Structure formats: C-alpha cells, structure tokens
Amino acid sequence: MEVELNYVVNHLEKLGPASFCDTPYSFSLSDSNAELGALSLKVDEILKTNYNLINPEDVTDSDNNEFALKDLTWLQNCCNEISQSSSTELDASVLFEAVIMSLKATEDQCAIQEDLLNLVGLDHIDLISDIVANSSNLIEEYMNQNDTSIAAQLSDGYTSEAGSSATHGQGLLDSLKSRPRRFSRSRDNRGPLFTGQQVFEVEKYPHVYGDKRLGNTISVIGKKFALPAGSEREDYQKYEEIIVPHAQRAPQMQGEKLLEISSMDILCRKTFLSYQTLNRIQSLVYPIAYKTNENMLICAPTGAGKTDVALLAMLQTISNYVESMNLMDESEPLDVHRDDFKIVYIAPMKALAAEVVEKMGKRLAWLGLKTRELTGDMQLTKTEIAETQILVTTPEKWDVVTRKSVGDTQLAEKVRLVIIDEVHMLHDERGAVIESLVARTQRLVETSQQMIRIVGLSATLPNYLDVADFLGVNRYKGLFYFSSAFRPCPIEQHFIGAKGSPKIVNSNIDEACFDKVLKLIQEGHQVMIFVHSRKETINSAKKLREQFFHEGEADLLDNSQHEKYSLAQRDVSKSKNKELKELFKYSMGIHNAGMLRSDRHLTERLFSMGILKILCCTATLAWGVNLPAYAVLIKGTQLYDPQKGSFVDLGVLDVLQIFGRAGRPQFESSAVAYIITTHDKLSHYISVVTQQSPIESRFTDRLVDNLNAEVSLGTVTNIDEAVSWLGYTYLYIRMRRNPLVYGIAYDELVEDPLLGSKRRELVSVAAGRLADNQMIVYNKKNGYLIPKDLGRIASNYYINYQTVSTLNNLLKSKMSEADIIALLSQCSEFSQIKSRENEHRELESLMENSSPCQLRDSISNTSGKVNVILQSYISRAHVEDFTLTSDTNYVAQNAGRITRALFEIAMSRTWASAFTILSLNKSIDRRQWSFEHPLLQFDLPHDLAVKVENQCGSLSLEELSDMSTGELGDLIHNRKMGPTVKKFISKLPLLNINVDLLPLTKNVLRLVLNITPNFNWDMRYHGNSQMFWIFVEDSNGLEILHHEQLLLNKRNVSTSHLLSFTIPVSNPLPSQLYIIAVSDKWLGAETVTPVSLSNVVFHDDSNPITELLDLQPLPITALHDPVLEGICAKRFSFFNAVQTQFFHTIYHTDTNIFVGAPTGSGKTMAAELATWRALHNYPKSKVVYIAPMKALVKERVKDWGHRLVEPMGISMIELTGDTNPDVKAVTNANIIITTPEKWDGITRSWKSRKYVQDVSLIILDEIHLLGSDRGPVLEMIVSRMNYVASQTNKKVRVLGLSTAVANANDLANWLNIRDGLFNFRHSVRPVPLEIYIDGFPGRAYCPRMMSMNKPAFQAIKTHSPTQPVLIFVSSRRQTRLTAKDLIAFCGLEDNPRRFLYMDEEELEMIVSEVEDKSLKLALPFGIALHHAGLTENDRKISEELFVNNKVQILIATSTLAWGVNTPAHLVIVKGTEYYDAKIGGYKDMDLTDVLQMLGRAGRPQFDNSGVARIFVQDIKKSFYKHFLHSGFPVESYLHKVLDNHLNAEIATGTIDCIQGAMDFLTCTYFYRRVHQNPVYYGADGDDQKSIDTYLSKLVVTAFNELEKSACIYRVNEETYAPTTLGRIVSYYYLFHTTIRNFVQKITENAEFDLALQLLAEASEFDDLAIRHNEDLINIEINKSLKYSAACLNLPMVDAHVKAFILTQAHMARLKLPVDDYVTDTSTVLDQVIRIIQSYIDVSAELGYSHVCLQYISLMQCLKQACYPSEIYRASLPGLNASSEKEARDYLNKFAGNKTDELYQMLCNDPNVFDIESLVNSLISYPKMNIEVSQSSSDKLLLYLRRLNQPLNPDFYIFAPLFPKPQSEGFFVLIIDSETQELFAIRRASFAGRRNDDSIRLSLRISMDIPPTCRNRNVKVMVVCDGYPLIYEHKIVLMI
C-alpha cells in the first residue's frame, strides 16, 4: 500500500509546487493538475484495498450488527479525538455538527464517504467506515435529542460566533465550500489527497436531472475521484486507451411527456413548423423558457437541442412585442413591433455564428424579423443594425460594441434578450470576455431599470451552480441541468494517449488512428477524422489509404457497389480538385476551408449519402456544417495558434463540438467518439471532457484592460464602483467558493465573507497600472477614476495596456512609415510570435524582395519577424510556410486595428504623424503601399495595372483627370482602355475645398469650408457612405490645429457641404495654413488646399474693461424717493458694487448707457434706475423695454408688475405675439415691454402712432444678441428711434444691457455713448463662480450626451450634494433622457430619494396635478423638468418646487436660462450643441446662451460661491476656455438680411435711392464693424475704398432682389419707390421672398391644396425646429393626411414639409406622436394668420377673388381645426351631425338665440352629446343685418349690425383648438358677378371698445369704387374669418 500511495504522491509532486505544497494552495487552474484524472483509477484501488473504503453494496447485516452499539456518545468522543489531533484545526463541536449535517443531507453512502473524507482526512479513514455503517442510528438518535445540549458537552470553552454550535456546524459546511485542506508530505501527518473547493449542496433543485454530484463520480470538491462506473483501461505497446462507456438513457419520469407543437400558440407552431413535438429536454424547459422571463442556464450534452431552447427564449421576447387578440388563433393577424427590441445571440466562433444566422433567419422569417451576423468578418451599417432584430455575434465583437460610449446607444437600449452559447468557455482565455459582458449587462439592467434576459447554454458542468449564480439565474426556476443520459444518441468515449518520444509519437498517433478506423470500417460504420490544418486533411487521408493497402484491407474501401455510385462518380468527375477525385475511389473524402464551396458541398453530400466511409476534415466542419456520423475521431490535439506563436492544445470547446457530431439518432441508438493525443495530455482531456475539474475564472488575466473599458464607458467612476463591478463577475463567485486558487487565505474569507478588501486590492492595483500608463486619472485620495483619451482609444480598439505602455515610449510627433511599422512590431499583441530557424530563409527572401521599409531589428527577433511579414502582407507576397502564413494573417488582422488606435492617439495629441499612420492603415487594408498608384485600388486587369503603374506614376491625379480619354489611351499605349482609365480616375473619391477666413479676434480665426465632392459615386466601390478627414495643419507640417470628420453618402454627394470652426493662430502670424481632406479608406485620395494668411487683417480690438472700484456700497436712501426706497427695501438695503458704480450716471444723467456685466450681477437695477428717472423727469413719456425672447418679456412683466406698477401708480403693458392689446391701452401705458420684432413692426408706422413718438427711454436687454440672426432687428430699432428723435426733436435715451463683450467700443460708438460705458469683467459677480470645462469624445451626438449623464451625477454628489442643481440640455428629448438616467443612478444609492425634500402626502398631491409622464416619473426622485413642451401648469409646478427647494434638481432646455430666474448652486451645461435641420446636423450654441446658463450658478442670498460644469465635445474645450474668460466679439448679422430691412425703410419713405441706403447704413452697428473687421464680412481689404465698394455692392444687390420680388420699382435712374407688394411685406413683417414665391406660383383658379402648399412654403418657416429623426415622424403623419407633402418636392426633413404636415395635422385633429410637435404646431399657427392675411391682400391686388375666398376658407379651417368639407360640423362641437347639411341647418336654426332658450330647445335633442360646448358656439355665432347702398359713383356704403351679443366683450370666437384667442373679424369683398374679378376688399371688426368702454354692435363701412367697375353688376360679400358665415348682396353700381 505504501508503495502505491507513494506512487501517487510522487506523481503529484512532479507537478511542482504550484499544484502540491505544504501551504494552502490549489492546482485547479494548472494544466498539469488535469493529470489527476488519469490517476483516478489508481486512487480508487488504493483507497478501497488499503483504507477499507466501503462500497455500500458490500455492507451485510453482520457488518451492521458489528457496529450496532455505536451511538452519539461514541461520535462525540471520535470528534474530540480528531479535534485534539494535529491533523485538523477544527473544533470538536464544529466537526460534530458538520458530520451530522453530512449524514442528514443524503442517504447515498458513497457521498457520505466523500464528505467525511474531506472533513477528517485520510488519517482517520477507519472511522469513516464506522460512521457510514451507523449513519441511520446516529441520525435517529440525534433527531430525538437536544442538539444544543449535545454540542455543549463537546467543548466547554467553545461558543460559536452565531451563538449556537448547530448554526456554526452548518456554517462549516458552507465554509468548506471554499476552504482547501492541506496536503502534507509527511507520511506521519497525511491529509486528504485532493484539495479544492467543496461544493456541498443540501438543496434539491427542481430542474436538475441526472446530477451525479453526490454519487461515486463527482466529489464534494467539484472534482471526480474516479472515472464513471464501467470505464475500462487498455494498455497497448504504442498507446494507452481509456474507454468511458456511454451513459444509460435517463428513464421516463412520472408524468413526463413530449410537448406537442399543436398545443402551443401560433408563434411556436409556425416557428417549429416541421416538428411534431419538442424533445425531452425542450419539453422540460418550455414552461420556463417560453412562459416566463427568468434568466436561465441550460446545461445539456452537445446535440441535445439547446439551440431550439434558445429559439423558445427568443419567441418569448418576441411575444412581448406582438399585438394580437388571440395568439392561439391562426386567423388573427400579428403585428410585430420590430423596432422596439433586439435579441443578441453570442456564439463562441464565427463559423457557429453563420450557422445560427442561417437557422434562426429561416425559422423567424415568417414574422418579418431579420437575423444578421455581426462579427469581425461581417460588419453592419447603422441602418442595417436598425433593421435587424436578432444579432448573432461573438463575445469579442459584442464587447467592442458595448464598451464604446459613443457607439449606438439605441442598440444597447433596445436589447431585451442576450443568449450566451457555450458558456462553459468561461474557463478559457476568452472567458474573461464573457464575464465582462455579463457584468456589464447586469449593471445596465440595474441602472436602466429595463429587463434584459440572460440565457446561458452550456455543456454539462461540474459546478453549474456557480455559473448559474453568475448569470443571475434563480436556482429553483431557471437552472436546468441534464446529464449525459439525456443525450439523444449516447456516446461511448475513447481517450487514447500515444506513447513514445516526440520523434515517434506522431507515428504512433497514425497507428492508433488506423487501428480505430479499421475497426469501425469493418463494423460497417462511417467515420469523420478531424485534423488541424488543411494540408493535414490530405496527408491523413493518403496515409490511411496506404495503411489499408499495407494491411491488405483495401477491399473495405471499395464503394463501387453503392446504388448511387455512378451518379456520385459523375459529379466528382466535374470537380477540379485532384485529391478529391483520387480519394473518392477509396470511399474517402476531404473537407477544409481551402476548398471551393462547390467541392465542400459535394463532399458533404457524398458523406451523408454513405458513399464516403472516411472523411478527413478540419474543425470548421464541426462548427459550420451539421453533418453527423456514427463515429468521430480527433487525430492529434496540437494546433498552431498565431496569437501565441506556438502550438497549443486543442480547446475543450472544439473537442465537445466535435464529439457532438457523433451519432445519428435517426439511424443508430449510440455513437462513439475518439480523441488521440500524446500520453502526457491524456489525463487532461479525460478531465475536461468528463467534467472532472470545476470551471475557474480567467478574469484576472484581463482585469486591467476590462477595468479600463468600464472607466472609459463611464460605468465605473471610482474605486467603490469598481469593487461593485467586480462583484458581478464569475471571478467573484469563484473567489468565494475556492479562495486559495486566487491567493486568498481561509482566514481572510472568514473575516471578509464578501471579499470587499480583496476586490478593492485587485481594482486598486489595476487602476494604478492604468494611471501609470496615462490611460486614466486615478485620485487615490477620493478614489475617483477619470478616463483619458489614451484609455478610451485603447478600450475602443481593444488594445491592451502593455501595448499602450510601448506606444507611450515610442510614438513621436514626426514618424515615417518605417518608424511606424517598427513601432507596431513591438506591440505586446505580437509578443507571442516566435522566430524559428526553419523560417529564416523564407523571411530573408521576403525581407529582400517584399519589404520596402528598412528593418530595425534582426529577423531572429520577434519584432524583426513581425516587421517583415507585415511588409510582405502589404506587398501581397506569397508565403510558403504554413506557420508563417498563420502568423502573417494574425499580424495583418491586428495591425489594422492597432494602427487605427495609433491614428487616434496621434490626433488627440495633434501630431502630424497621424497622416502617415492613416496612410499605413489604409495600406494594410488595401494591401498596397502609399507610393503605388492609387488607381491600382480598383479591379484593373493585370496588364492594365502594370501599364498604369509604369506610365502614369509620374503624373498627378489632377493632371490625369484633365486628360481626355484619347490622351490617356496614348499614355498607356492602349487607346481602347483610355475610357476605362478615365472612368476609374473619376471614381477616386476627391474633394474640392473653398475656404473663407473670418477673423474673430487678434488670435482666433474662423474658417468656413465649402466642400464639394469631385467624383462619381459607384455603389460597387463606394458603398453607402464614404468618410473623409478634414485637417488644418500648420505651415511647418508638425501640428494639427483642427480636425473634423465629413461623412458623404450617395444622396448628398452632389451637394456642397459647409464646415465652420475656429482655430487659434500664433503670433507672429504664419504665412499660410494647409487644409487637407483625406479619404478614410482610399490611398491617394487626398486634397491639399493651401490658405494664405497674408491678406487677413487682424484688428486689435482694444477692449475697454471697466475696473470695479473699491467703493462703499451705496444705500438705497440715495434714491431720495420714499416710494422707490420702499420698493428696494423689500429686497436689499444697499446697492451692490456694480450697481454702486453705475448709479450716478444712470440715475442723475440722461446720457446713453451700456452696461456689460455677467448674468446675476444686478444689471436689471440699471433698467429700473433709468426707468424711474425717465418717468420722473418726463411723466408723459413712455419707456420701452425690449427683451429678445418672449420668456424674458413674461419674466419682466411678472417681476415689474408685482414690484413697480402698484407702488408707483403707473401702467404697464405687454406687446408680443401672444397678446394684442388695443391702441387705447398702449397709448395709456407708461411702460411697454415687448420683443424686437414686435417693436420693429410697430415703429415702421411711427408717423401714425403717436405713442412711438412719445418714447423717452428705450432699454435693450441682452444687446449682445446683435450677433445672432435676430440682431439686425435691434440695429433697425435703434437706427429708427434715432431717426424718430431727429424728426420730432425729442431725445430718446438708449440703455443697452449685456454680458461683457470683447468690442464694447464699437457698441458704445454706435449707441452714441460717451461717459456711460460700463464693461465689467466676467469675474465681476456678487457670487464668485468656479467654472470647470469637461471634454467628452465622440462625433455622434446622442451617445455623447448619454456618456455625460454619469459624470453629471458625480458632479452633483461632489459639488452640490444637498443644494439646488440646474442642468441645461439642448432639447426636450434630452430632458427626458437625462432625467431617466439620473433616476437610474439614484436607484443605486442608499437613499434613492436623496434629492427630494417633501413628504409622501405632499408629493402625491402634486404629482396628481402633473400631466407630463416623464415629469410624473421624475418628481418622486427630486428631479423636475422644464421645457416648452410642458403645459403651463407643469412648468409652473417645476419652477415652484425648485425655487422652494422641494426638489433639488431641475433639468431644463436653454430657454430657461433666459426666461425664469431660478438660480442654483451648481449649474451643469450638458452639451453645447443643438440640432439644426438646415445643415442636417448639430450646431454650436451661441456663446451668449452658454454665458446666460452659467449666470444661473450661484445664489446671492445663499451661496458664498457657485459652481458651473460645462460638458462639451473634447475638440471644443480650447474654444470655451478662451472665450468664456476673454469675451466674444459681437459682430453684425445685418448684411445677411439687409434686403428685408431696406424694404421696410423704402415702404415708409425713409429711403428712396441707393445713396440714401448707403447713408442709412452709417447709422448701423454693421457699418462700424465692417470698418473694424472687413475680412469677416467679405470685403477685399481694410482700406476705405474696398469697404465702400463692398457696401455699395451689398446695397445694389439688395435693391435688385427687392425688384425681383416686385417690392420696389425704379422711378428714374436714381430714385426708387415702394410697390403695393412692398408695403404688404413691410406691414405684415414678412420676408420679401415669401411674396415672391406666392406671386410666381399662384393661379387665378387655385384650389385649397395649392393654397395650403404656398402657405407652407413661406420663408417664415425656414427656421422651424427640425430635430433628429423627425423626417421619420413626418413620413408616418403624412400617410394620414388628405393632401400629401409630396407636392412640395422637398425632403421630409425640410422645415416647410413639417409646416405643411403640422398645419394639416391640426386641421385633421390628429393626435401628434411626440410632445415637441404640439409646441411646434403652436409655433406654426402663430405665423399662419399673418401670412394668410398678406396672401389675401396680394390676391386682392391681383384681382383673384377665388384665391381670396380660398384663403379665407383656410383661415376658418385653421381656427376651427378642420378641413373645408367639415367646417360646419367642426364649428358646432357637441353636435353629432351626420352631414354638413345637417350641421348647417342647425346653425341656421339656432345661431344667435339666447342661452336659456338654446338649453331648453337642445336639452332633449338626441344628436347633442355636449350641450355646453354646442351652446357656447351657437351663442357666439354672429347674427347680422347688412345694408348696402351707393352714396356716390365712387363710394359704396355698408351698414353692419350685429343682432346678438358676443360670447365675450373682446368678441373672441369659439375656437377651443386654436392655441390663442381669436377675435371675430370679417372680409368685405366687391366681386364682378360675371367675371368673378375682385374689385375691392376691406376688413371689418366689431372688436375694440367705444370711448365709453361699451361694446360696439354696429359698423359703418365706406369703400372706394374703382372707375373700372362702375356700371357693373357686382356682389358684395361679407365673409367671417372664423366661422363659415357668408352674407352676399348683389347690386348694380351707378356710373
């Protein structure tokens, strides 16, 4: 016995200290540990023979009698003895409880033996027999006694931590799951032979079938002590064979039956169309897989039908998105919401992915679902991904997709099911990827609060419970384990180990292979032989053939007697594969990926027909093709792995997959599988195939890189989150179960059961390594982890941190291709590649003939070899050696990815070496050097390619493109090919670039690029899109000043593209810059545009800064007015420093003033001081306050109305598009608060409006908006008011309020300011402000915005954990998305409602009043939303809750910064871009908007300082750093819209000639700026002559445009006069292009649809908001409209199309799909009435009566929200009229009656369903009497008398669906009765009160009769503009 045990011990000792030592350590991960499996038989024999280990079948009654007297006292004594011995550290009481628990857990005595063996070791193995034999007696006695008292007898001094030994006894069993036992080398102190994890499970799980874990094959430590029962061992001279018999089929369980497909719903029935029933496993899994959403782990043998289980899970997910009344009824239609979900199937290999795509695609095609492969070989476009519901991918590819923060976030958001196939590859090197994916998915589920189901498919696992826990599977529901007994065709497994030295082992493998194949063929079976290279398939087949002949068994290979032999022979004869033809004669075939597809299919067909008996193939056949055989044989297990640069063992995945091909259930009841390996690997394969070793984690191998991925993604932002993240990995599961494997001592696990310290140690070390490599910023004090560009790039391109370390040292700003290739060669990705002596000769040849770049290292080194083979690959050199070919492919695959990473790193460092790196990257992709001719990238015939290279190489592409086809033909000496060459030249993607330079300041330049594609698009070569890089390079070629990406597609290739950006320029100014446009994929497709800076004039705008003086704060008593002091005293007692400084100038002088100061510094007080002075000194004058936005107007009206109006006894009025006060109210007002456009429109008629002439003070708030598109209006207002003042001799004081600007001098000069200029620094604030600018990478907007949410949450926790926070976003959608993510982050906090400060009762009451769903969801978490899409009440609730500190966070659009004064301690500007449909992309916000947002940071009455965080795109950080502190120069926008404003002045008579216009311009701000910065505006120089020429040209162009629009006409050579159209344009405040378009397209008989079209085409809708993807919404709405938007001939993304659609949607009363469209509809309806009125006037001018009536009808329809055919029914809400006639009859009958009478008449009417609405509409309907008379030949008199009272004093019509109240109005038309020509038109309205404030019910109208219509028969029509009301009177006009 000692000798045999020593054999075992000595054999184990040979494995080394890593697997066998005195210290606690495990060898579970060691490859050599697998040899334990081979010793299992030996150990069994030793234990049984010498240790009397009992087999339960051998225990007899007499044996039991011998032990009958053993009781608990005996057991107690035994435990005491064991505890006192030195072989265990266990306390007696603990050991006693563990033994009892083991006895209670199972009746399986073999299992009890193994448990006790682990507990007490081999030293006490004799006691085990006694305990096992007396187990029933011991348990019975134990159950009858008090276990606590028994335990107390064992050890007086022992007390468990839990307070009871019983509890600790159970705890011991649990702890033993992860506590290894020591193995001592001392014979005198022997412990158990086997160490490792104890997986002692007492629970019985409902779906574990055939688990032998507690039987005699699997031990409590998760490893087998012995091979399965019945295993045999055969020892031959040349090899050893272990035969594992196939498992017996699992017997049918009670009640078990196969599930019939016919009993399922339609989804399953049609998907499993060819099935009658599911198989056993599928039937058992079905209730959970299809009926629930549980996570699942299905462990079952290969070939058991797991793929169909995955399909069931897919169908369950799909069913959640299917609309059907009854899924059991096939006649019911199915509507699948395909865009709402994604399913991801993760396959271990690309070949399997392709197979899954084919299978799933066919099965689910009937549902219209698309299945696509997304792997390294199969890339998908964004559109393809959007169209795909089921993505089949590999772990690495899905890792790449999900780790990109700027990836397709919508893809990740829509994933609802992740299926992981072959999850047992966790133990493989690639297992770390699976762990990373599962952890990321589970954390995404938690943060997003959206369920993502995870389904794992696996072969049978020894520790499947660990994997189930890792996948988040409920053990009692989603865990399914099926032993090999459930395999459809049980497999007998043969493990053969070839003996001998390395020189002869291959020969012995051949011998063993032949022996087994011969036996199988003799038995009449087919066999598939798997080898590991294409070449070996042929060699093995030929070797076998020779052996058959040598042994005289060649007759067995004769297949000529097969019935289909002749047909097969004919097919084979057509093949060009010589080996295939030759081997076919001997019933042998070959199959590998190097064969033609037709030959592979032929081989598969012949084998399936049985004609081929032997098939030699590679593993690709096992993965890619379902071709089973009775027997499979793996010949050899060594294959070349280029990633490691050496031969490695065949992976268990491949072995199991190949073994899975054994067996054809339809033909045989069993199968056989062989694996032939070397003898030293035999035990390894026995272990892994028979599941003897538990699956361990390999996550630590990739921990550093995976941590970097999570930090870069933004899901891990500090060490605590990293520790939490590690808790989701399989590593964490296994560290707790088997700690010693991972270097964790038992005591450490006891003290820290959750391993928090160990996890913190692991992530801290990993974070330190990342920080050392400049990949992240690691703040060790607070644990923050902040990603850096280098880390993001490494994560996105799957670059490991060792390579990054190399790059940090070797990457330079200037590098040649040779330098870059040398750098690539040293990357760690290639460190495993070895240089072998047998390759040197070929490498030398390749270096000499195919390596144009000089080598830095010897080919005997790894880097030298990589260098050569990479260059050879680019040169398309042929490589002979097999391993060298594999290495070349591996290097090529990785080099492209690494060079892309290098390119981005170089760009992030602004290094010009980026160009060279990009060029090399394209060379690798194209396999062509940059010095070769670009045309070679096309598929040129070989002879033509040679001629192009030889003849065209010296000519540039520009020269070639200028040549004719004939010249090109002559050049290449082949005239026929001239057109071909010309065609290819035209397809090379090149760009033309025109550059405009716009100096902003003395060191900042704006470049505007007009880019025009200069090539012909060909889908074959260009695909769907082409990417270009636009670089701005300095004159030295060393630095990239700026870079942009430009994406072209076939749709926009024919249009020009504008790019605008700013760059810093150095001092002294460089002579030129280079604009370089480079194709992302095409070599030689480069355009270099030099830009000279010699003519650029940078004016030094000396910015006058007003220093803040050290003054004593001025008390409010300085006002010397008790009323004003009382107003101020409610808020403060002293003016602040800024107010103190400007107080005297504003309050005691009449000089014009400019106050430039940051938001929040008290500028409003300047307006109040000036107002008080104006009203005091000029009491009859008016003050006009002009704010740029309606929101600001409303804020000012609310503020001053509350504070000033009543105390001062003054009146104030609001003038905006939302309010229309009558003239009397405006005339009586002291203060007018209005918008620029409204005041501009009013002052255009200043001569007829006395209140305009009475203005003494005009306040221009936010005057820095001069530079915006609305700025010209401000210029015109100031210029016009100055003109009015000069005409009336009344001075108008101007006060301009602004943020600090960089060119305040120009503003002061324009405003005629001398002593009143106050331009304070940005830092001058009552509350100091800290500003942080954070850059975020990525070009895609939405993913970038999403990546900002986690940093925003962290910023709140850092800067303002309890104080108010204001988050500004760019759109309404972003408010919702941001709130959603913040809520998810709150959910992960200890207190999810940390931002809420009100009780539940108050919250419920408030939420009940909220309408918006997103706001309802956000408020309970202390987050409010604010945007224009909310109702007024919702906005008010959000504002009040935030101001009153009931909620801490307010997420708002940028308009809130202007509109509502809601300061906060912390302001986060989340993105500085917004979507602009005009450019079809995202545009930067005005800097003034950003400054306004920042101004909301800091609360003067609460905060000592404020904090602002600006989140911007990384490339824009420098821009904001510069201008946020220096101020942005204010430029003019007037030159872009000069024509419209000149038209207004011409219409009013202010201008009548070009010189007058020139003189008028001198009064504008534009005139001053064009002299200061002429190049910015397009002047040729900075001298006066150039500027005058520019201005003259500008004015002449404007006049010409107005003439084209018929707005002006030339009176004589110099003088111009306005036309009626020009006056209409001015009066209605329209663009002249609107009227031009109308006049050009309108026809006399135009119908309603054309009227609607021309309305939508108005230029006023040019700026209607278009958001991302709204074209898709437009398409859907358009389908429901009466008139299609196709009539506009514009793309669906166009603003005019949207206006057309919204206008109709309003009339059709459609429910709009998004809230944004509701607000947009209001915006459109704000404009339409004004435009329609102008169209009516123009139509009247043209004499088109029909058109006038059409537009009046359109106006009625818009107000009543209906089409013309529904106008009567729409005008009578509450009436269910069946026709228009019926509605009209009601109207004629009931309109104008009194309210009481109507209620009485209609109360019982069955057609009335809403009597209140109906009555309101009827009583508001005007009932009139009209009299027409002619007082003279040129006058027509009309008398209109209203017979009923209006609904209200303002004569508002009943139009509940129109957004604003509409007053009742009428059109009076005089129309020729015969020709229908319109002679005259007049508006009339009863609205407007009399002087005595009574309402007016009668009108007298006098109309001029044109001479042309006298003595004509005319009809006078009075048409209501809001109701379908027409009065007609015919009259013959007198002469």
From Swiss-Prot:
<feature type="short sequence motif" description="DEIH box">
    <location>
        <begin position="1261"/>
        <end position="1264"/>
    </location>
</feature>
<protein>
    <recommendedName>
        <fullName>RQC trigger complex helicase rqt2</fullName>
        <ecNumber>3.6.4.13</ecNumber>
    </recommendedName>
</protein>
<comment type="function">
    <text>Involved in activation of the ribosome quality control (RQC) pathway, a pathway that degrades nascent peptide chains during problematic translation. Drives the splitting of stalled ribosomes that are polyubiquitinated, as part of the ribosome quality control trigger (RQT) complex. Has a role in meiosis.</text>
</comment>
<feature type="domain" description="SEC63 1">
    <location>
        <begin position="787"/>
        <end position="1093"/>
    </location>
</feature>
<dbReference type="InterPro" id="IPR035892">
    <property type="entry name" value="C2_domain_sf"/>
</dbReference>
<dbReference type="Pfam" id="PF00271">
    <property type="entry name" value="Helicase_C"/>
</dbReference>
<keyword id="KW-0677">Repeat</keyword>
<dbReference type="InterPro" id="IPR036388">
    <property type="entry name" value="WH-like_DNA-bd_sf"/>
</dbReference>
<dbReference type="GO" id="GO:0005829">
    <property type="term" value="C:cytosol"/>
</dbReference>
<dbReference type="InterPro" id="IPR011545">
    <property type="entry name" value="DEAD/DEAH_box_helicase_dom"/>
</dbReference>
<dbReference type="GO" id="GO:0051321">
    <property type="term" value="P:meiotic cell cycle"/>
</dbReference>
<feature type="binding site">
    <location>
        <begin position="1157"/>
        <end position="1164"/>
    </location>
    <ligand>
        <name>ATP</name>
    </ligand>
</feature>
<feature type="domain" description="SEC63 2">
    <location>
        <begin position="1618"/>
        <end position="1934"/>
    </location>
</feature>
<dbReference type="InterPro" id="IPR004179">
    <property type="entry name" value="Sec63-dom"/>
</dbReference>
<keyword id="KW-0067">ATP-binding</keyword>
<keyword id="KW-0378">Hydrolase</keyword>
<comment type="subunit">
    <text>Component of the RQT (ribosome quality control trigger) complex.</text>
</comment>
<keyword id="KW-0547">Nucleotide-binding</keyword>
<dbReference type="GO" id="GO:0003724">
    <property type="term" value="F:RNA helicase activity"/>
</dbReference>
<feature type="domain" description="Helicase ATP-binding 1">
    <location>
        <begin position="287"/>
        <end position="479"/>
    </location>
</feature>
<feature type="domain" description="Helicase ATP-binding 2">
    <location>
        <begin position="1144"/>
        <end position="1319"/>
    </location>
</feature>
<dbReference type="Pfam" id="PF23445">
    <property type="entry name" value="SNRNP200_wHTH"/>
</dbReference>
<dbReference type="InterPro" id="IPR050474">
    <property type="entry name" value="Hel308_SKI2-like"/>
</dbReference>
<dbReference type="InterPro" id="IPR027417">
    <property type="entry name" value="P-loop_NTPase"/>
</dbReference>
<dbReference type="InterPro" id="IPR014001">
    <property type="entry name" value="Helicase_ATP-bd"/>
</dbReference>
<dbReference type="GO" id="GO:0002181">
    <property type="term" value="P:cytoplasmic translation"/>
</dbReference>
<dbReference type="InterPro" id="IPR001650">
    <property type="entry name" value="Helicase_C-like"/>
</dbReference>
<dbReference type="GO" id="GO:0005524">
    <property type="term" value="F:ATP binding"/>
</dbReference>
<dbReference type="Pfam" id="PF00270">
    <property type="entry name" value="DEAD"/>
</dbReference>
<keyword id="KW-0469">Meiosis</keyword>
<feature type="domain" description="Helicase C-terminal 1">
    <location>
        <begin position="513"/>
        <end position="723"/>
    </location>
</feature>
<dbReference type="GO" id="GO:0016887">
    <property type="term" value="F:ATP hydrolysis activity"/>
</dbReference>
<comment type="similarity">
    <text>Belongs to the helicase family. SKI2 subfamily.</text>
</comment>
<feature type="binding site">
    <location>
        <begin position="300"/>
        <end position="307"/>
    </location>
    <ligand>
        <name>ATP</name>
    </ligand>
</feature>
<dbReference type="Pfam" id="PF02889">
    <property type="entry name" value="Sec63"/>
</dbReference>
<dbReference type="InterPro" id="IPR014756">
    <property type="entry name" value="Ig_E-set"/>
</dbReference>
<keyword id="KW-0963">Cytoplasm</keyword>
<dbReference type="InterPro" id="IPR003593">
    <property type="entry name" value="AAA+_ATPase"/>
</dbReference>
<feature type="short sequence motif" description="DEVH box">
    <location>
        <begin position="421"/>
        <end position="424"/>
    </location>
</feature>
<dbReference type="InterPro" id="IPR036390">
    <property type="entry name" value="WH_DNA-bd_sf"/>
</dbReference>
<dbReference type="GO" id="GO:0180022">
    <property type="term" value="C:RQC-trigger complex"/>
</dbReference>
<feature type="domain" description="Helicase C-terminal 2">
    <location>
        <begin position="1351"/>
        <end position="1546"/>
    </location>
</feature>
